[in-house]
Amino acid sequence: MKKKLSLTVSKLTCKRNSISIFNPLSFKVSEGQMLLIKGKNGRGKTTLIHCLAGLLSYQGLVKWKGVEGKIGYIGHKFGLKEYETVYDFIKFWKAVYGSKVCIYEVVELFSLFNVLFSPIAFLSFGQKKKLTFVRLYFFNNNVWLLDEPFSGMDDNNRELIFNMIESHISNKGMIILSTHEKGRILNIKNTKEL
């Protein structure tokens, strides 16, 4: 029997140079929910995401249940090969994850026709960030950790990301998302704030 997806965090703290980045945190997130980590720059949002991803050491308890495979993560560094074309990037990640999704479908969904054979180095910041969501789309996992996913995105790409988030939540996925944004993101169904 498949375990229900959940994340339980108890008394989580993280220190750098013996200084606490944030006060001890405790919260629970279940499948079909998004935890919205709000706050100004420098308040520990990225540090918290890194702790949950296992990228930083911490004190306290972080307990994942029902996670199938790996956790999808999008942060500030994209991990893109600048010399690679967009097409090569898409083809590579489709193969890595064994995705059955057609390349044409991805190119159309993410509006990549006009840059398909361009080297990634020629793309704007927002276009590069969009490619990280292409990778997440192929990954097809149930937990997403998204650190400031809307920064550098134009209105059309923001809409695309909003739709991906809403779809993921409605399909019983879980999202932990950090942002300093206000507005529509706060209105996504089944959202908890931290």
Predicted features by range, described:
Residues 101-116:
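Conserved ABC ATPase "signature" region
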Residues 77, 82-100:
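Q-loop/switch helix immediately C-terminal to the Walker
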Residues 133, 172:
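Hydrophobic anchor residue at the start of the ABC signature
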Residues 119-128:
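Conserved ABC ATPase signature
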Residues 148-149, 165:
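Walker B catalytic motif
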Residues 7-9, 21-24, 153:
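Conserved structural motif at the start of ABC-family nucleotide-binding domains
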Residues 41, 147, 153-154:
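ABC-family nucleotide-binding domains
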